[in-house]
UniProtKB/Swiss-Prot annotation:
Reported function: Promotes absorption of the essential vitamin cobalamin (Cbl) in the ileum. After interaction with CUBN, the CBLIF-cobalamin complex is internalized via receptor-mediated endocytosis.
Gene Ontology MF annotations: cobalamin binding
Gene: CBLIF
Main location: secreted
Domain of life of the native organism: Eukaryota
Positions annotated with a glycan in the UniProt record: N100, N209, N311, N330, N413
Organism: Canis lupus familiaris (Dog)
The keyword Metal-binding is annotated on this UniProt entry: no
Protein name (Swiss-Prot/TrEMBL): Cobalamin binding intrinsic factor
């Protein structure tokens, strides 16, 4: 796909620093603006000195126009002082972009990231799609810093993707699109034409794959991948074969917000830029001039009448049938918890009643992730992890966010990716 092939559009985009989608036909209606304001307040309230600094949160705050200067400065200070050692390429790339969006110098973090990507082993074309998410973020961050230096790294990533055989992943596809669109628009003058052809072909294939994930209600992939996918589709000057109705997507997302689907800070960070008509390509153009930010007036909500919550029963199964793992088991327990409890409460009650259900969690940018059950731990080397399902459907929320229903059957299945 020829991204920003019209030279005039390319110049306008570079000068304005904004994406070119028709915001007038895909913007948040004034009547629903309070929903977006509420999300942003919730996001910024999640920032504290006790919580791990999340660069995605800072990027979203800056793209949206931070309401709390105190929260923004706290997050920027902590990320600026963070040690690059031990960070994945994706985490380091996000940190660089977060600092740039705050008009902070990322210092030697850029050189560290470039060194990591130079040493990045070319993955097999059949590697899981998510393994390309971090490198795509790295290409995007390096493109915004020094596109000429990023060119060979981006070309290596694009060549691997061009031969890709692994199942498509919407989040990764969206990040690939943003990264290679940045590179396509910033190919240094005098570079070989082959770079443009390579990026164009990969972009065409990836965007077509994203468009095939557009559901009838406008959701792209699932509700939590839609934010990044909106960014990706909004920066393409050449629409995919399946037309994207941006307004339908926006309307459905607003309904999901109204129903309380977005309360995890990371999920808010990924949807907020699109609600504000921004993308990660706008990071270098964020204005850092001082200005008085007015806290939005949120509609007052009537105080809920205290009620005595009834109990629900959840069937909870832990299952490991992987060959080569010493302990094989399939155990089910019925757990009674208060209605409205999150899944984590179910796991804690199961663990209290039966030590076989003992579990360990790890904190990630998306919140708590279960990393071990019954002394069987996930392993990057063996590509194993604990997948949670409702019936046969994988959950798209974490254990601290998902609220099970009465008589729902939740399974934790030890599996490979």
């Amino acid at each position: 796909m020829a991204w920003f092939s019209l030279h005039l559009l390319h110049l306008l985009w570079a000068a304005a620093g904004t994406s070119t989608w028709a915001r007038s036909s895909c913007s948040v209606p004034q009547a629903a603006q309070h929903l977006v304001d509420g999300l942003q307040v919730l996001l910024e309230d999640s920032v504290s000195s006790a919580a791990p600094p999340n660069p995605s949160v800072l990027i979203a705050m800056n793209l949206a126009g931070a309401l709390s200067a105190e929260a923004r400065e706290l997050l920027a200070d902590r990320l600026g002082a963070s040690d690059s050692a031990g960070l994945s390429v994706g985490q380091l790339a996000l940190t660089i972009m977060a600092l740039n969006s705050s008009c902070r110098d990322p210092g030697n973090k850029v050189s560290v990231l470039y060194g990591q990507m130079e040493a990045w082993p070319p993955s097999s074309p059949s590697a899981p799609a998510w393994t390309f998410y971090g490198p795509s973020l790295a290409v995007l961050a390096l493109c915004q810093e020094h596109p000429g230096r990023a060119l060979p790294v981006a070309a290596r990533l694009a060549k691997i993707l061009a031969a890709g055989l692994s199942p498509f992943n919407t989040d990764t596809g969206a990040m690939v699109t943003l990264a290679l669109t940045c590179m396509y628009n910033k190919i240094p003058e005098g570079s070989e034409e082959g770079y443009r052809t390579l990026f164009s072909q990969v972009l065409k294939d990836v965007v077509e794959n994203i468009s095939m994930r557009i559901k009838d209600n406008g959701i792209i992939g699932d509700v939590y991948s839609t934010g990044l996918a909106m960014q990706a589709l909004s920066v393409t000057p050449e629409p995919p074969n399946k037309e994207w109705d941006c307004k339908k997507t926006m309307d459905t997302i607003l309904k999901e917000i109204e129903q309380g689907k977005f309360h995890n800070p990371m999920s808010i960070a990924q949807i907020l830029p699109s609600l504000k008509g921004k993308t990660y390509l706008d990071v270098p153009y964020v204005s850092c001039s001082p200005g008085h930010q007015v806290q939005p007036t949120l509609p007052s909500q009537p105080s809920p009448v205290p009620t005595s919550a009834s109990n629900i029963t959840v069937a909870y199964t832990i299952n490991n049938q992987l060959k080569g793992v010493e302990l094989v088991f399939n155990e089910t327990i019925d757990v009674s918890v208060k209605d409205g409890s999150v899944l984590l409460v179910v796991l804690e009650e199961a663990q209290r009643r039966n030590p076989m259900f003992k579990f360990v969690t790890t904190m990630t940018s998306w919140g708590l992730v279960v990393s071990s059950i019954n002394n069987i731990a996930e392993s990057v080397h063996d590509r194993t992890y604990w997948q949670f399902l409702s019936g046969k459907t994988p959950l798209n929320e974490g254990v601290a966010d998902y609220t099970p229903r009465d008589h729902e059957h939740i399974t934790a299945n030890f599996t490979q990716y």
